[in-house]
């Protein structure tokens, strides 16, 4: 519980991924089925973060959530082979991105360099250039390959995000 710091029992959690994992625990009878559907639940859970500092925390929280649900169901630690697959899915589905441009923040070089002694009107917004890399996401079901975020965004059905991690407002909505 973020307001008290008290741990919430697995069976009482109501997060988006928690609800999926609770249903999986209820309807599966074998470890293999549980692992299969838990991976599918993580595949269907996307999120991006602008700064990068909260990204590690979000990834760790997803990993710990799945591990705690596994332990709650089977009363043993999840196997390493399952955790490796899970780690890959988490790494692809939670990434760093400027949500306004669909690109990696702060990756373009400033041709003038940083002026460490100027504290006036410093523009710390990401530099957007033609060569700035586009973010890529993994299409687990339809393509089974990485695709550019712009391509996914352009599809008629689009992509919904379960989480946008971070502490807004870091982005200026007038840019991008």
What are these regions (language model features)?
Residues 1-176:
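SAM-dependent methyltransferase catalytic region
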């Amino acid at each position: 519980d973020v307001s008290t710091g008290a741990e919430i029992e697995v069976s009482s959690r109501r997060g988006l991924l928690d609800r999926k994992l609770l249903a999986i625990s209820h309807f599966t009878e074998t470890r293999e089925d549980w692992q299969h559907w838990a991976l599918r639940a993580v595949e269907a859970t996307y999120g991006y973060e602008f700064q990068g500092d909260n990204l590690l925390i979000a990834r760790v929280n997803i990993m710990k959530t799945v591990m705690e649900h596994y332990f709650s169901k089977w009363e043993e630690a999840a196997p390493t082979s399952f955790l490796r697959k899970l780690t890959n899915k988490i790494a692809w589905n939670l990434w760093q991105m400027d949500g306004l441009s669909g690109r990696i923040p702060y990756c373009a070089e400033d041709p003038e360099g940083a002026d460490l002694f100027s504290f006036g009107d410093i523009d710390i917004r990401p530099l957007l250039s033609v060569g700035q890399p586009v973010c890529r996401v993994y299409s687990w079901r339809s393509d089974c390959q990485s695709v550019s975020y712009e391509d996914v965004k352009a599809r008629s059905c689009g992509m919904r995000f379960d989480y946008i991690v971070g502490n807004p407002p870091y982005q200026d909505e007038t840019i991008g």
